[in-house]
Amino acid sequence: AATSAKEMLRQTFDVELTKTRTWLQERRVTFNGDAKLTQLYNTNLFFCMFFSTGITLDTEELVLVTSRSPRYYVSAAYWDRDSLLWSFPAILDADPERAKEMLSYVFGRQRRNFGIHSRYIDGTVLEPGFELDELVAPLLALERYINKTDDKSILSDTDIVQCISLI
C-alpha cells in the first residue's frame, strides 16, 4: 500500500483522477432517455465492482465476497447467490474479463463446497446447510457468461468440466 501511495504521488493527483474517471467512463452503462435508470444502474454496478470482489494481500488472487463493507454482518464471507446472481450480471455487462476471472475463482477455489450456505474466501464452510440457489448459481453465471460473450472455450477448462459433473 505504501509503495502504491508513493507511485500515485509521483503521478500527481490530476493524472490519477483522469485515469480513474476514464476507467469508470469506459465501464459505464447508459440507458438512452432515462437518466435516473442510468444513474441507479451505474451506482449498483460500481458498488458490485468495488465491494463484491477484492484482491488478497498475500497471494494477489481475486476473491469474491458477499460484501467488503464493514457495515455488513458477514463482510468478506462468500455466498454463491450474492456473488453470482446479484453482482456477477452487472460486472459481466461492464467487464467481461473480470467476469471470467470471477468464474475461475468460483469453479476453482469455491468448488469443493458448492451448495453450502456460506463459506470463507478460501472455500471452507462458514455456515453449514444446503441451499439450492447456492448450488445452481455457478451454473447460471456460467450460462450467462457464455450467452453474453460467446466464449465457449471456457467449457474446456478442467475445473469447470469437473464442477459441472459434480453438480
Protein language model annotation of sequence segments:
Residues M8-L9, F13-E16, Y73-I167:
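Aromatic-rich carbohydrate-recognition surfaces in CAZymes
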Residues A1-A77, S153:
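Acidic/polar, glycine-enriched structural segments that form the non-catalytic walls/loops
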